[in-house]
Amino acid sequence: IVAMGSICDVAEEVIDYLTAHGEKVGLVKVRLYRPFVTEKFVAALPETVKKIAVLDRTKEPGSIGEPLYMDVVNALSVEGREGVTVIGGRYGLGSKDTPPSSVFAVYSELEKDAPRRQFTIGIVDDVTNLSLPEVPAPNTAAPGTIECKFWGLGGDGTVGANKNSIKIIGDHTDKYVQAYFQYDSKKTGGVTISHLRFGDSPIRSPYYVNKADFVACHNPSYITKDFPIVRDVKPGGALLINCQWTPEELEEHLSAAAKRYIAENDIKLYLINAIDLAIEIGMGKRTNTILQSAFFTLAKVMPQEEAIQYMKDAATKSYAKKGADIVDMNHKAIDAGATAFVQVDVPEAWKTAEAAPKTSDIDGRPETVALVTNVMEPVARMDGDSLPVSAFVGYEDGQFPLGASAYEKRGVAVSVPEWNPD
């Protein structure tokens, strides 16, 4: 592979995995793009190279190839290097994630006797049919890396708490740390996803966490909406759900697919009612401190007493200017969160849970119903990145049917106002 930018770190991870399994693969990182020195580039290529895939993070409509691809082809021609097959691919357009599975797909394509000259990765392109088929990839992260994922609501403090958590782990242990944060366009009141990694080896994973050792859902509506939260958990991992439900009530809200996944993959399931606890302590809607404390207890990154003390020190530093009452409230929340969760015994019957038949009750103009069904509903379920290109046929110029916002009822509030006319 010849590439530049963050995909090089992903490729390195995959190369380490493949070479350990006897494959002969490699990577040339382009660090200085202009001037493009052809003799230096060709000198960096081993004599044994037979095939090259050049990855560009851009699209040149009307061109016979993207810029880096054209430079590589030209460099080989100018320097007289023959017998090398060169193909070009695009990745990362529209902020698409590029996980290891995409890099595995590129090397699989190169193994073919006649690889396609142009391709894309990271999206299912069933219109021009340029995308490479991807299969679930093995975990290529450094051994011992712990991966965590937190689903929060914009404004609930989840992102801030996770920034504090990663600082505590990085400052007070010998572990390497990494954090990425995803937001939707709504900011406050929208979905936030925090991706945390920490481990004893350097972390070269510039992509989102796909399968996590620990997953926390900080808003119960995400469970009823059947967000892909449960399938984020690795087999044997832990799932913490913040809700006001009892274990019996939780069973009513989990989908059949979620129940089967939890039971079949030995997921440790925990419930915590940080919503009522925060109100009781006086924190209002801010559940982040309670949930952060529960995370440190369950994740066992460091001794519990140390983690609690470091969280209290951070809270004191953050809220000292707001007065002793605010600091004390946060300290109470930290102490409460460390023990407020309960483990749920997963019934054996969940392994055979069956989904109730779905009924569509969408009514309206045919073009609006088609948009809602094919685009808006998957996006609302946080499955938008899995949509194929064909889902957008008919909307190429950016025009959408009017009146579609009426179908977006998010229902993320824990409480709703009651009007009192008196």
Label each region the model flagged.
Residues V2-E23, F36-F41:
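Redox- and metal-dependent alpha/beta enzyme cores, enriched for Fe-S-associated oxidoreductases
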Residues E13-L27, V78, I168-K175:
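Short helix-loop-beta junction
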Residues T19, G26-K96:
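C-terminal non-catalytic interaction/assembly regions of soluble proteins
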Residues P35-F36, T48-K51, L55-E66, A142-G154, ...:
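Active-site cofactor/cluster-binding pocket
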Residues F41, N162, N420-D422:
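Extended, hydrophobic alpha-helical segments in both membrane/secreted and soluble proteins
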Residues A43-E47, T98-S108, G284-N288:
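Short, surface-exposed amphipathic charged segments that create phosphate/polyanion-binding patches used
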Residues G94-E147, V327-D422:
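Flexible inter-domain linker/hinge segments
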